């Protein structure tokens, strides 16, 4: 796209418009300024609320993919890419899943997490190549993230995923975007112009984070990675998480600390297994068999 055409396209995007509520921010006190930002931020969850049907549809597709051995793959550039990598990286410690189950890809690779990579988002072919590098297949779900809805790198990835017959989801903050035209499910969080014109790391980025939270949390809950609202699959990899595992077992079973610690020791710090052992009054092997028979879903295993 020529510079003139790009300028024309950007001028039509909501995310690139000037916000009438922040025209004088360079004249405000610190308190006045953060009040303006806070007031604008209040619009974000309301914009996300309007997309709940599409978000739920995406969750159902992700759950189906997980159950069939597929993965959830996020792809984006800049802030959008970083948020995808962030959400993906939180899944293993929170839900005890493989780091391959939810994958985050950012234009420009690992270095782009901390430093801007010139031109990385403009390469359509690289989006496709980066999916090929992680062996993306029809079984996987691709979520393309870009506030503008027009990032070439993400469009290239979405087009490739679609050509394979994989489920494609777009997250953008402009309506009727190029990404939305490609994706099977379009999540358009229309948060309005940013406080700082064009700075989509602000409201648009916050909306993206809320949506990503929903996608992984709801999907993991639906495949049995929690019990009630407890993170029973937590990986107790540090002192804080070991203490959390003890607390989770105590809350789920109403046992005392000693019982929780002793059972966790037998269960090799597996909180879900420890809970199963206590609530079913069974040994480790029997508890493991019960969980396996119900695909790791603790509530279902306990009901039998």
From Swiss-Prot:
Residue ranges annotated for the SIS domain, each copy included: 62-225
GO biological process: 1,6-anhydro-N-acetyl-beta-muramic acid catabolic process; amino sugar catabolic process; N-acetylmuramic acid catabolic process; peptidoglycan turnover
Pathway connected to this protein: Amino-sugar metabolism; 1,6-anhydro-N-acetylmuramate degradation; Amino-sugar metabolism; N-acetylmuramate degradation; Cell wall biogenesis; peptidoglycan recycling
GO MF annotation list: carbohydrate derivative binding; carbon-oxygen lyase activity; ether hydrolase activity
Superkingdom assignment: Bacteria
Active site: 90 (proton donor), 121
Keyword Nucleotide-binding appears in the UniProt entry: no
Record-linked HAMAP family: MurQ
Subunit record text: Homodimer.
Annotated family: Belongs to the GCKR-like family. MurNAc-6-P etherase subfamily.
UniProt protein name: N-acetylmuramic acid 6-phosphate etherase
Organism: Actinobacillus pleuropneumoniae serotype 3 (strain JL03)
Gene name as annotated: murQ
